């Protein structure tokens, strides 16, 4: 009983403290008195059912498992940290330094690439500006060329109305093969390629006249002597297309009908199949660049060694050591002759090259051929040719190496050579006398005004040197001593 009282007293005190306890008294079924007290749950508003309690327990278990997992993770981290501290701080610092160095290198590489891209972009902008400027300049040049072309077309039309009809009247005598080539139209591509920049030179300066009104040096007046002086070059015209960089132009020192001393022939020698020979009946037509006729050779020629003499064109056949005689009026080949042992196609050229192995020349005494052979070991060989049959009448072997000189020509039976094809201040450096068989050193100034003389020939009728200097057709006055 005292125990029950104490229990009751404790419950009362706890109930008073909790302020939610309730005490009630009642008889049970047997009539015994029972004391019953209740206390409110501090967390739950109502008593959970059995299923809810199980769910709560499962939630607690999951929380506990999660807590255990986190605790295990923390223990693992603590273990790793402990191992790292045991290994010493230096290794960790070194690893960090290495990683930091790698990152710095990558940053420097990225910065370098950025700078290079900026420079490339700047260069592109500059190139773009330069291209735009070039485009503008080319547009202006195109407009200027169009104006010049229009002016040239008008000039051609004017000349056709005035000066050129006589060229058509003579075409009846031309064979059919050449008649087709001789029909020039201002709109054709061939005609446009023949356009040239003209240098106005009075005809009186080209064909100097004596007081009687006739040109000097008529046939029978040999005027022979040794070369002592060469004047400044006089430019007659300039070829416009690339085919005119090298070439040969000539007049016949002994013209035959229907050609005159004014008739001029021109050949552009850039190319592999050189067959066209442009004929200009008048000196004015040559200066203006309007051919009166175009010959098409039956076989191609090679290099710049051709000459015209007594109505025939003499030239070296391409890829051979053969000299060909082509009669200009009949437009047929009259003779061919292989020069014995002569080098060709680059074996013994002049110093500028150009397959100038065989070079023909004309002087007061007739027709010559300049070449070399294996037997002569590259020295110049000079032979006199029969102009009809091309037989060698006489031959001289000199001691002048052909590849050491730029060009050669013959005056009054004397062979003269030029020291350089490109130097503005070249010289006539050697002379060989066929009369004595001796050579001598000279130092006569010779001007290569345009620095690429590919052809130099002597015209005994006009007493001038004709030359082709880097697209330009020029002449040189000369002075000969008295024999």
Swiss-Prot record:
GO terms for cellular component: cilium; collagen-containing extracellular matrix; cytoplasmic vesicle; endoplasmic reticulum; extracellular exosome; extracellular space; Golgi apparatus; mitochondrial inner membrane. The gene is MYOC. Keywords: Calcium, Cell projection, Cilium, Coiled coil, Cytoplasmic vesicle, Disulfide bond, Endoplasmic reticulum, Extracellular matrix, Glycoprotein, Golgi apparatus, Lipoprotein, Membrane, Metal-binding, Mitochondrion, Mitochondrion inner membrane, Mitochondrion outer membrane, Palmitate, Secreted, Signal. GO terms for biological process: bone development; clustering of voltage-gated sodium channels; ERBB2-ERBB3 signaling pathway; myelination in peripheral nervous system; negative regulation of cell-matrix adhesion; negative regulation of Rho protein signal transduction; negative regulation of stress fiber assembly; neuron projection development. One of its GO terms (molecular function) is myosin light chain binding. It is found in: Secreted; Golgi apparatus; Cytoplasmic vesicle; Secreted, Extracellular space. Residues 153-179 are annotated as: Disordered. This is Myocilin. Residues 223-482 form the Olfactomedin-like domain. The keyword Hydrolase does not apply. Residues 1-18 form the signal peptide. Gene3D superfamilies: 1.10.287.1490. Residues 51-162 form a coiled coil. SMART domains: OLF (SM00284). PROSITE patterns: OLF. Disulfide bonds join 224-412. N-glycosylated. Palmitoylated. Homodimer (via N-terminus). Can also form higher oligomers. Interacts with OLFM3, FN1, NRCAM, GLDN and NFASC. Interacts (via N-terminus) with MYL2. Interacts with SFRP1, FRZB, FZD7, FZD10, FZD1 and WIF1; regulates Wnt signaling. Interacts with SNTA1; regulates muscle hypertrophy. Interacts with ERBB2 and ERBB3; activates ERBB2-ERBB3 signaling pathway. Interacts with SNCG; affects its secretion and its aggregation. Expressed in optic nerve head, ciliary body and retina. The keyword Amino-acid biosynthesis does not apply. A motif (Microbody targeting signal) lies at residues 481-483. Pfam families: OLF (PF02191). Glycans are attached at residue 43. InterPro entries: Olfac-like_dom, Olfactomedin-like_domain.
